């Protein structure tokens, strides 16, 4: 039965047309960061268990050109231990840049055992920084086994002009490495590429126009931000503090979805839903059920 489910999804993903987005998109930030180690396979599966419709994640590139999940461009000592369970100093952690390490080295770190005081509700377990391909395989298999509906992948390219060839490759290479995995795993119809870096979104729009894009913004007006980007993305993803009734109407009038980040209070979720947003990104998926 599992083979049947997977083969059906593989067949359908060959059609490059994007799948319809959920009526209201419930997104788990870095999986389910408030409840599980961030950007890990267990975190993504937890989000699925909680009936989220989209898995949000961050990407970095290793020295051997592997696509991995991590928000930071180097080891984060706040929640990372060596494979032997030893602490890592901040000074040492900053030297351990992923773009200068091969994946075999990256995989040796434990990002799930150490208590993370910012997220005290996190379940603790020994887990490694995964490849994007590992995450996709695990998610697709889990969906097949559990019978849960197909989820979307909201994938952020963590890049900036200042970091080119220092912390990550240039945008055209970054996007190609990511899309090689996405297309190879045949999840293109359920993929959204998001970024604060307009350059990666511009490359995506030029070379992969069939793939949905999401423009992350933290400040500025809609008009100015879209002018900087140079095209109209599928999704406009502002910081929650920027969202007003007027912005929601303006974004939707241009044919975009509006999905704010990162909303970790039930009262704020209720406010945004009342304004008519198309989805919400949160660290705490359990808030949707309260």
Feature-to-residue mapping (PLM):
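Bacterial N-terminal signal peptides
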Residues: 1-5
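Phosphate-group recognition and catalysis centered on beta-loop-alpha active-site segments
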Residues: 6-290
